[in-house]
Design a protein with these regions (language model features):
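Catalytic-core region of carbohydrate-active enzymes that cleave or remodel glycosidic bonds
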Residues: 97, 244-254, 281-380
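Aromatic-lined substrate-binding rim segments of carbohydrate-active enzymes
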Residues: 48-124, 238-252
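Aromatic- and carboxylate-lined catalytic core of secreted/periplasmic carbohydrate-active enzymes
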Residues: 335-461, 470-473, 477
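N-terminal carbohydrate-binding accessory modules
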Residues: 20-62, 94
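Bacterial N-terminal signal peptides
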Residues: 7-17
């Protein structure tokens, strides 16, 4: 088997060096994942797989993220069982779904809990990472060649099996390598093998990538000796480990590859969160160390969704969110990332365990996004012509102004308008969000929920005075409670320039080729007599807005 791996490595080097090789951008451009990730144990039997896959189709997913378990794939060393993989692929095809397999190999959420028992028991051959005090961890050491070879043999057989079953069909659309790699209890591994590597020289390519001038330095000389320096050291070696697996995958069955990261949130220091994984502040290290991996992807569970997403929308790193807290706001968050970043996809975690109120919102959002695919997918010719944006609001983040040439799109949460009693009665605001696409001059699609959008020229906006509105839609006297832009004030000023007006607002559906199908017209009270386009909270619509100037 070792000779086989060596042959694969040689072929991989030749394959990866060819100039015809696809870039990460090209390879991931076909992805438009309206996904959901199964809970960790939801695919451990064929009965579970048979039960869960029909439910995923009913939620309007187009892709299911499914674990591939090393311990169940190779329960006895050298003997492989792919029955769970085969059943997943079969059920996906039956329900017209794509699959992203998650390789739960040497590490899952930092730990080596999905390694087979024969691997776990033989700590002499497959050593553990250690803290600085010498405490062994339930984490296989990334510095052990034996650990890598065992993981790689199983991963290689897994990829070979996928190629045999799926090449030319394409049910499997992407592979996640390991799961939330990272060190815990210490910022780096202090095992004997790790200490030997730490005393060595920093690779020249990493020093160059990080803007370090001096070559031939040790890790301590180049980066210092604190926990942040330890994290850089560990990140490099995790990345190099993953790169070797990625090269095997690329050679055996070429498809998009990514690694996911648990966020370093809540003020924790390295060692207190899963350190050295593909985190945003380590993106340079990971991109240098694992160039064959197409995407570094965030698992977002904490507050500040927009901020976390922005950190991973980097040049050469298409945004994909493989895990996010499944909640009633998941739907508008999906609309936001697909509109703002033309993301590769969005996938709430434990979708099989979600409550109906949570999956209902996600299903409605995915129904809109599936229709918007001709306008949002990076592989669509329309992406070469039209711009798109995403908006996402809550009770504290209520407005965004988008500049599109001389036109401003003044976007706000729907509850900034006062006539819905939920806006002012103390009810917590649901998040509102949308994907907005410009399909022609002065012509837009808005797909979302809980948003209101005004359209004004820049000169008009500069001369506008905010007028607080009452629940009847007219100017409110006294202290402002909510506002909508208006031209004019109590003082007389001469207006200059042109104004933007709404020609019409239509509710539409969209066919697979991008053709708009008229459903109904929103006018009068539904667009505030031509002042804005809006979609109510917990309503889900696609609006086609045509503007004019006067």
């Amino acid at each position: 088997m070792r000779k086989t791996l060596s042959a694969i490595a040689l072929l991989g080097a030749l394959f990866l060096s060819t100039a015809a090789r696809l870039s990460a951008q090209d390879r991931t451009s076909q992805l438009y994942i309206l996904g959901g990730e199964l809970s960790n144990s939801a695919a451990t039997s064929t009965a579970d797989i048979d039960e869960v896959m029909p439910r995923m189709k009913a939620i309007r997913l187009n892709t299911v993220l499914v674990p591939a378990y090393w311990d169940l794939t190779e329960p006895t060393e050298g003997r492989f069982d792919f029955s769970l993989i085969d059943r997943t692929i079969f059920q996906a095809r039956q329900h017209h779904l794509k699959v992203v397999f998650l390789w739960f190999g040497a590490w899952k959420n930092s730990m080596s809990c999905y390694a087979p028992l024969w691997f776990k028991e033989n700590t002499k051959k497959y050593p553990r990472a250690m803290t600085r005090t010498g405490k062994p961890l339930e984490i296989a050491s990334a510095f052990s060649e034996e650990v890598f070879q065992a993981d790689c043999r199983a991963f290689t057989r897994f990829m070979q099996h996928l190629a045999e079953k799926d090449k030319g069909i394409g049910t499997v659309s992407m592979i996640q390598i390991e799961n939330e790699i990272g060190m815990l209890e210490d910022a780096r591994d202090h095992s004997p093998l790790a200490e030997k590597a730490y005393r060595g020289k920093v690779p020249a390519e990493l020093l160059k990538a990080m803007g370090k001038q001096a070559a031939g330095q040790t890790w301590a000389e180049a980066f210092g000796t604190d926990e942040h320096a330890d994290e850089i050291f560990m990140a490099w070696h995790y990345a190099r480990y993953v790169e070797r697996l990625a090269r095997v995958a690329r050679t055996v069955y070429d498809m998009p590859l990514y690694v996911n990261a648990a966020m370093n949130s809540r003020g924790r220091k390295p060692g207190e969160y899963p350190s050295a994984g593909p985190l945003a502040h380590l993106a340079t290290v990971w991109k240098c160390g694992a160039p064959t991996v197409d995407m570094l992807s965030p698992d977002i569970y904490d507050t500040g969704f927009k901020s976390w997403a922005a950190q991973y929308a980097l040049p050469g790193n298409r945004l994909f969110i493989p895990e996010s807290r499944c909640c009633e706001d998941s739907g508008v968050r999906a609309l936001y990332v697909m509109g703002e970043y033309q993301a590769a996809g969005f996938s709430p975690f434990a979708i099989d365990q979600a409550q109906p109120t949570e999956t209902r919102a996600l299903s409605r959002a995915y129904h809109l996004l599936s229709q918007m695919q001709p306008y949002l997918s990076k592989s669509s010719p329309r992406r070469k012509t039209y711009n798109s944006w995403g908006i996402l609001f809550d009770q504290n983040d209520r407005q965004r102004i988008i500049a599109d040439g001389d036109l401003l799109l003044i976007c706000r949460h729907n509850f900034t308008l006062p006539w819905d009693k939920r806006a002012t009665d103390g009810t917590p605001w649901p998040e509102g969000g949308a994907a907005i696409v410009k399909i022609a001059p002065r012509e837009y699609l808005i797909a979302g929920s809980g948003v209101v959008v005004e359209f004004k020229t820049k000169t008009e906006h500069l001369q506008a005075q905010p007028h607080p509105l009452g629940e009847d839609g007219f100017t409110l006297g006294g202290k402002p409670a909510a506002t909508e832009s208006a031209v004019g004030s109590h003082k007389a000023h001469s207006f200059t320039g042109r104004r933007s007006g709404i020609g019409y607002v239509d509710q539409v559906s969209i066919l697979a080729d991008g053709t708009l199908q008229y459903l109904r017209r929103d006018n009068g009270d539904q667009d505030h007599q031509g002042r804005h386009a809006r979609i109510g909270a917990r309503d889900w619509r696609i609006l086609h807005v045509k503007l004019y100037e006067y």
